[in-house]
Amino acid sequence: MYNIPDNVKGAVEFDPWLKPFADVLSERRYLADKWLYDITHATPDGSYQSLSKFARDSYKSYGLHANPETKEITYKEWAPNAERAFLVGDFNNWDTTSHELKNKDEFGNFTITLHPLPNGDFAIPHDSKIKVMFILPDGSKIFRLPAWITRATQPSKETSKQFGPAYEGRFWNPENPYKFVHPRPKFSESVDSLRIYEAHVGISSPEPKITTYKEFTEKVLPRIKYLGYDAIQLMAIMEHAYYASFGYQVTNFFAASSRFGTPEELKELIDTAHSMGILVLLDVVHSHASKNVEDGLNMFDGSDHQYFHSISSGRGEHPLWDSRLFNYGKFEVQRFLLANLAFYVDVYQFDGFRFDGVTSMLYVHHGVGAGGSFSGDYNEYLSRDRSFVDHEALAYLMLANDLVHEMLPNLAVTVAEDVSGYPTLCLPRSIGGTGFDYRLAMALPDMWIKLIKEKKDDEWEMGSIVYTLTNRRYGEKVVAYCESHDQALVGDKTLAFWLMDAAMYTDMTVLKEPSIVIDRGIALHKMIRLITHSLGGEAYLNFEGNEFGHPEWLDFPNVNNGDSYKYARRQFNLADDPLLRYQNLNEFDRSMQLCEKRHKWLNTKQAYVSLKHEGDKMIVFERNNLLFIFNFHPTNSYSDYRVGVEKAGTYHIVLNSDRAEFGGHNRINESSEFFTTDLEWNNRKNFLQVYIPSRVALVLALKE
């Protein structure tokens, strides 16, 4: 008999395999709950404050803030290793003595208030350059961008030649800040489907250039709405000095990337998305930070252990990413990161977050090397001796979920990028879980690419495909996808490219009959996406361009490609060209999203799979009263194919991958009705018979 602590009883009831590890789970929850208590009582008199108040008060007090009524500017910075601090910039001609931050408190916080100029203007002009200078214990001086800076820009070529390429901090205080006019879309995480369009603003144009927030708003948002997605996951928003890092080497956590435009233009983008009923999620990077010193957090106050684990501890640097690792056990680090989330929810109206690098956070080995080979043995996650879990990082993730769900009750979406399969990651905090709403189903793209690369079509194992698509923890929702930005990067190929390769350059025209390669590629591209969408999870994600089979890979400008933008773009023009077959894939993707929107299968109970036939290469399943039929056989078509179904009645076709407009062959009569026979078949109470051609998928629904 196991004694199950009260604070994890709910989680153990969900997953009985947790029983032997209940004490460890309980300790992990206790640490987060203790931190939560400490934070919510970190007031002058020890009275209670909510977690969201703590986070909001933090981003409103730290950094630079302009008071429109008094015209005063306040600046607060935490730099415990510094002896003195001075604010310098264009506003005081970079005078290193005139504006000293006073009142260094016991925690290492410096503050200054700048009174308005005699003419009543703010002492620091809008968008002017600014830095903080610290004097260290040894008397040396260092210049940094304020840690909470809300705008940082690339220096001009002249400045770069003279002072180096470090980003420049700017005081952002526009006279007419953008005012949101549209409410957040109505979304209930418990019942509504999440169809996510993963996008990177900078590459969102067919032209070899950096796309702007404004262009994305005008040209890409209508495209996403047309396709039927109800959420956008925006990458590379947090400021990063190195464009080719894809946004994952963050330098300035509170600054929206200036490459794409201004903070106000990003607000307009999000507000416009909301007007279209589209949620906007931020791809948030709290797993590590750029090593940049002059324009980043590294060595910010002259020490290597202010925000991060010290280098000497062996925990301060990521072994593969060449980046710094946060010390989540520090109160001020918790403040900084939690305030960062609150800032994006409030100031930019983001509706949730996809947390990057969760596996790296969860384990002290960061999922690298031997420790990163997870077999699914619960000891790897929960054993005292063998799990190598970073309890402090896990506790931080629990607090992050507490905060986001407190700020956006019944609306917030949090997604974990975890490849390890950590149990309880997506169970509610209240029962002992980590609190995420979804985890990414990271095994799915690997499966599809491995199949296409290594197996002939007639060697595909239906049972193996179904197992991988349905292999998820009970009660923990996943975001299914067959490819994301990871698969599009240089060195890998998109699904379409694996399927059709060089033929995409010559044979995608509608002016001639499709080649065998193109015909197969288009058919399988549709089937793979539909079966992943309908069987693989409780939400779905697509990386921009892949919906229409974008050819080629992604490669950001860097020294190895001569700083070329040729592959750092999305060729939407291909999908808009009526003479190319990309439009067929685009239209199928739209119909698939709209079919899900109408009939809802994602955020429902897992499917019942009634058939996995290896010889016929058939997969049949039901989900939310819909009947899904897939024929993966490369050559065989079947007439009067018997299919089991639980509910009796008359069925009709609601989605058919063989339509000509989807690049199919129009072999299906969509006006057909299918009547059930009251005889058991494949463990279902009834059966019906269908014509199902080779490499075709059908979705049937009961006629109302």
Swiss-Prot record:
Do you know which Pfam families this protein is assigned to? Answer: Alpha-amylase, Alpha-amylase_C, CBM_48
Where in the chain is the site Transition state stabilizer? D486
The source organism is Saccharomyces cerevisiae (strain ATCC 204508 / S288c)
What does the UniProt function comment say about this protein?
A: Glycogen-branching enzyme participates in the glycogen biosynthetic process along with glycogenin and glycogen synthase. Generates alpha-1,6-glucosidic branches from alpha-1,4-linked glucose chains, to increase solubility of the glycogen polymer.
| SMART domains per record | Aamy
* Binding residue positions for (1,4-alpha-D-glucosyl)n: W94, K131
Record's keyword annotation contains Zinc: no
What compartments host this protein? Cytoplasm
Q: Name one GO molecular function term.
A: hydrolase activity, hydrolyzing O-glycosyl compounds
Q: Which UniProt keywords apply?
A: Cytoplasm, Glycogen biosynthesis, Glycosyltransferase, Phosphoprotein, Transferase
What gene is it encoded by?
GLC3
Q: Which InterPro entries match?
A: A-amylase/branching_C, Branching_enzy, Glyco_hydro_13_cat_dom, Glyco_hydro_13_N, Glyco_hydro_b, Glycoside_hydrolase_SF, Ig-like_fold, Ig_E-set
Name the record gives this protein: 1,4-alpha-glucan-branching enzyme
Transmembrane spans: none
Which GO biological process annotations does it have? Answer: glycogen biosynthetic process
Q: Which CDD domains match?
A: AmyAc_bac_euk_BE, E_set_GBE_euk_N
As recorded in UniProt, its EC number(s) are 2.4.1.18
